Swiss-Prot record:
Binds 1 Mg(2+) ion per subunit. Belongs to the succinate/malate CoA ligase beta subunit family. This is Succinate--CoA ligase [ADP-forming] subunit beta. Substrate binds at residues 264, 321-323. GO terms for biological process: succinyl-CoA metabolic process; tricarboxylic acid cycle. It catalyses: succinate + ATP + CoA = succinyl-CoA + ADP + phosphate; GTP + succinate + CoA = succinyl-CoA + GDP + phosphate. Residues 9-244 form the ATP-grasp domain. Pathway: Carbohydrate metabolism; tricarboxylic acid cycle; succinate from succinyl-CoA (ligase route): step 1/1. It is an enzyme of class 6 (ligase). Mg(2+) binds at residues 199, 213.
Length: 389
């Protein structure tokens, strides 16, 4: 789950990490009220969407007067914005964040994440903040510093001070940096986060460090014990079909192709998409219907797939281990009838009660195309889509 900047800053502040004073507003007049409550300007007005790159897209404005604040908020609120991170998708701007604006002396980068390669929690820091860290890594990798945290020792103050001196900070600032690192480690663990990125972590004209922007990503598997984070979810920033799928507890990800996939098991689902690609097709989605699939679940999965008007064919690839193939077949037949499927449907069944499942499909009288294996199914669905075009 992703978070808005204002939500990230709220969490950072709760854990003692300095952030500029600010508050969100839903209307231009509210934005002016917030600005006045923060004292004399200048201020920053920032569009709240689940994406970076807002500045280049016109979503971050420096304002010297409250008239500027009102104009900036009016221009953003109620509109949609796309950035280089949204892949052309426009996200609605329902809120703006109004903050104080100090003069930036230096921009740094700091993040904490789970490094699967080293199997540790890892800090990444750089003296080059305010830009994409991938760009820094590619052009000046010597400016990137990493720390793999020992699970027994945890992160200590001396780790932060050492990092701070590597980034060119003075003794006072290195001490602040150490405090931020220690508090960030506590936040990361207590909130079951997968990533926290502060970019930039800036030195302002008062000589102190502030988190000017924050990007969070949480571990959805821990949502059951993170009620505060779940309450922060903004479904307006998410793909509508993916939101519906999450409410049905179906693992679904929208993609750009035209061949819908319904599979049980994440590994088999990824393999299915790969084989479709190898046969010249383009998957329209990742959909893991799960090991506990039943007839109604299969119907809902078909509805999810067909909610996209880009889908021109469907490949159902089921390995019946926990789930029974005959039950899946019943769900497919019911779904085709209920949903009114008008695109080619290719079905590959294997495993428990496979013969019963295949017989049900044959007896249904429906134009369901059987497949013997995953490659055969991928070839047939790609061919069926081409022939139907």
């Amino acid at each position: 789950m992703n978070f808005h900047e204002y939500q990230s800053k709220q969490l950072l502040a709760e854990y003692g990490i300095p952030v500029p004073a600010g508050k969100v507003a839903a209307t231009p007049d509210e934005a002016v009220e917030v600005a006045n409550s923060l004292g004399n300007g200048p201020w920053m007005v920032k569009a709240q969407i689940h994406a970076g790159g807002r500045g280049k897209a016109g979503g971050v404005k420096f304002c010297k007067t409250t008239d500027d604040v009102k104009a900036a908020a009016a221009k953003m609120l109620g509109t949609k914005m796309s950035t280089y991170q949204t892949a052309g998708v426009e996200l609605p701007i329902n809120l703006v964040l109004v903050t104080t604006a100090g003069e930036i002396v230096k921009e740094l980068y700091l993040s904490i994440l789970v490094d699967r390669g080293t199997k540790t929690i890892t800090y990444i820091a750089s003296s080059e903040g305010g830009v994409e860290i991938e760009q820094v890594a590619a052009e000046t990798p010597e400016l990137i510093h990493a720390l793999n945290v020992d699970f027994v020792e945890g992160v200590q103050g001396y780790h932060g001070r050492d990092f701070g001196f590597k980034l060119g900070l003075n003794a006072k600032q290195a001490g602040q940096f150490a405090s931020i690192m220690v508090n960030l480690y506590k936040l990361f663990n207590e909130k079951d986060l997968a990533l926290v990125e502060i970019n930039p972590l800036a030195i302002l004209d008062d000589g102190n460090l502030y988190a000017l922007d924050g990007k969070f990503d949480s571990d959805d598997n821990a949502a059951f014990r993170q009620k505060q984070l779940v309450a922060m979810r903004d479904k307006t920033q998410e793909d509508e079909t993916e939101v519906t799928a999450s409410e049905l507890d179906i693992n679904y990800v929208t993609m750009d192709g035209n061949i819908g996939c319904m599979v049980n098991g994440a590994g088999l689902a990824m393999a299915t998409m790969d084989v479709i690609k190898l046969n010249g097709g383009e998957p329209a989605n990742f959909l893991d219907v799960g090991g506990g699939a039943n007839k109604q679940r299969v119907i809902e999965a078909f509805k999810l797939i067909l909610s996209s008007d880009k889908v021109e064919g469907i490949f159902v690839n089921i390995f019946g281990g926990i789930v029974r193939c005959d039950m899946i077949a019943e769900g497919i037949i019911a779904a085709v009838k209920e949903v009114g499927v008008k695109v080619p449907v290719v079905v590959r069944l294997e495993g428990t009660n496979v013969e019963e499942g295949k017989q049900l499909l044959r007896d249904s009288g429906m134009a369901i195309i059987p497949a013997d294996n995953i490659n055969d199914g991928a070839k047939k669905v790609v061919e069926a889509v081409k022939n139907a075009a």
